[in-house]
Amino acid sequence: MAATTTIPLLLLLLAATVAAAAAELSVYHNVHPSSPSPLESIIALARDDDARLLFLSSKAATAGVSSAPVASGQAPPSYVVRAGLGSPSQQLLLALDTSADATWAHCSPCGTCPSSSLFAPANSSSYASLPCSSSWCPLFQGQACPAPQGGGDAAPPPATLPTCAFSKPFADASFQAALASDTLRLGKDAIPNYTFGCVSSVTGPTTNMPRQGLLGLGRGPMALLSQAGSLYNGVFSYCLPSYRSYYFSGSLRLGAGGGQPRSVRYTPMLRNPHRSSLYYVNVTGLSVGHAWVKVPAGSFAFDAATGAGTVVDSGTVITRWTAPVYAALREEFRRQVAAPSGYTSLGAFDTCFNTDEVAAGGAPAVTVHMDGGVDLALPMENTLIHSSATPLACLAMAEAPQNVNSVVNVIANLQQQNIRVVFDVANSRVGFAKESCN
């Protein structure tokens, strides 16, 4: 009798284990193997960081409705995942972006899009364009829909409304898109009626645009976790591969199942109503080696009114600190390195030195301290970047761009590589765990 009851119990446990497993996708970076060295590649990528940082630190222009821009004045994210869109599924490489809500894809026909490999709505039986009467339309900034008639009390009949259309800037260009829905496939998971922007034309240079589209992983109603409902239980994580590992991939895990690491240390996730897509955390201090960095009081304080605080972002390349924080960090780092020939600047980096002149172990590690007792000790690869041709290394962080809105610190993807970062929106927390992602 015991055996007959044990077998069904084991089957139930097995089914629960399978159901709890997280979906997993490979994550690739955009650094090409022919690049001269990781240092030169990162310098080139970091040139576009300033525009993204200004976007992250600026407040929403209007109050009221919570909107999700199809795109922004940001630089393209550095990492991509393979996803399927449509029925039958069409494979696309979508840029991974934790600071954007909306997903969008370049759609055919589009003679000005940056890639010839476009999503073809005509080949998908589940594709549908969405009219201005769609409840999703007001959530997108920049929609071109007719205003309500009859003194603002009555709207045109749904059948007479055009497709909800957009024209939005992105980097140095802008694109025109229509609101649509289709089946999004991530690994073995299928999410029907997924709302996204279908890009039909691009104006301006396309060099800095994602080649095929973007996957929005922010916190707003248009983002993946919101549209997926209970499928992923409000949790995803990623482990980003090193810029040095051209031929290796990291992973994006969706869901709170067994695929997420057990040794995660969590810090509370803060929310800014003006930038509700962003993942804010409360940094309490920095240390270089065993020395705490002396920063002015309140330098890390979260302020929803101004946007000040610290954001964890997948699309910014190098970590930026506001002027007083970075000045103090740089001073302590230089004091400990004590490079005999001093320091030079290279691209965005102002603390580069000759490694031949510094004793072994002379470059100290940087640790980011957060609420909840989280001490994110950055590996040396995440602290310094090296030239492959010369004995030159640079502190892989920089000062935030000087602008009235540049009040936000950003923990960027270079400092996150080979670390599992868990975004647990359901429990309002962000977690970190060491992991070899390559």
Curated annotation (Swiss-Prot):
Glycans are attached at N123, N193, N282. InterPro entries: Aspartic_peptidase_A1 (IPR001461), PEPTIDASE_A1 (IPR033121), Peptidase_aspartic_dom_sf (IPR021109), TAXi_C (IPR032799), TAXi_N (IPR032861). Its EC number is 3.4.23.-. Belongs to the peptidase A1 family. PANTHER family: ASPARTYL PROTEASE AED3-LIKE, ASPARTYL PROTEASES. Anther-specific aspartic protease involved in tapetal programmed cell death (PCD). Directly regulated by the transcription factor EAT1/DTD in anthers during tapetum PCD and degeneration. This is Aspartyl protease 25. It comes from Oryza sativa subsp. japonica.
